[in-house]
Amino acid sequence: AEMLIEQGYAIMLFGSAKDVDVGEQIRNTLPEALQPFCVNLAGQTSLDQAVDLIAHCAVIVSNDSGLMHIAAATSRPLVALYGPTSPTYTPPLSDKAIILRKIEGGLLKVRKSTDSAEGYHQSLIDLSPQDVMEAVRSLQA
């Protein structure tokens, strides 16, 4: 989020009520001066509202989720982050999408000792902000 804000983007974090804490963690990792440019909308929007907001975004960065597929349907530039789920089975159906995935193969459900205590698969942890920024830049070129 910090790198995107430094490039002039404002950040909207979407999700359900169960994602509020994760959204706040993301927001709180930002320097205080940048926090006003990151709004945690998790649990605060209806699906219709989220779709409307996503449709107006300059670029979307999303994990493999329902909102990622909505973003793909809006034909907005999209960076789709895949961990243990497979884009072979659930790809974003858009020619304006870049898929980032650090592992090969199909659906991987096995938890590994290198996964975080919060349950984040190591393959998602391995996706760096630099990887995401490179994809965003290529979509904006």
What spans do the regions from the language model cover?
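Short, structured secondary-structure boundary patches
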Residues: 33-38, 86, 100-105
